[in-house]
Amino acid sequence: MNRIKRLANQKKYSRLFFDDAFYIGFFMFLVVPMGMSLYYSFCDYDILSPPVFTGLDNFKHMFSDGTFFKTLKVTFFFAFVSVPLKLLFALFVAMLLLKNSKLSGFYRAAYYLPSIIGGSVAVSVLWKRMFSSNGVINSLLQAIGIDCTVSWLGNTNTAIWILILLVVWQFGSSMLIFLSALKQIPASLYEAAMVDGSGSVYRFFKITLPLLTPTIFF
């Protein structure tokens, strides 16, 4: 009886230990920084000197600045285009890799690699060289007879699309999440739908997509 109580207490303390570790990390690395950011938004603060409370002056300056709404518009456009494209591409590749093959492990690693190195300085320099006025992209266009000397990252009309492409290129982490979620869908659902004569499009929209909704909005 005492042994059972000791085991129960050990499980209880272990659970409390892991729960406390999560809550401490959540509080220290999320709640505290968010609270500090909110407080500093009402202050005049330059890191080197103590913050001076200024009330709503920062917000008044922000809304009176003509570039604020333009920046907000570009940010929303970037998010509304890049996020759906990244999710769609990740889901498409995950469904292709769902079929087991000898090279599936290699493909998963290859597709995941950009997610690891995508934020590095080397990749930033590489993309800058690729899309500069005398970069690789313009050289390839000139090789097929298209005279192009535009600086893709220096042009306001094209720079946003290059940045979106850079985000979509790092779809590997989302692809692995989708791949794991797809494997959790019972095969019996697809088999029953096929017996009823349902096509692949119907199965995707009536089975796959609804069951992936929690993952998509995660």
Cite the ranges covered by each PLM segment.
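A structural signal for multi-pass alpha-helical bundles of membrane permease subunits
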Residues: 8-218
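Membrane-interfacial, low-structure loops and terminal tails that flank and connect transmembrane helices
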Residues: 2-3
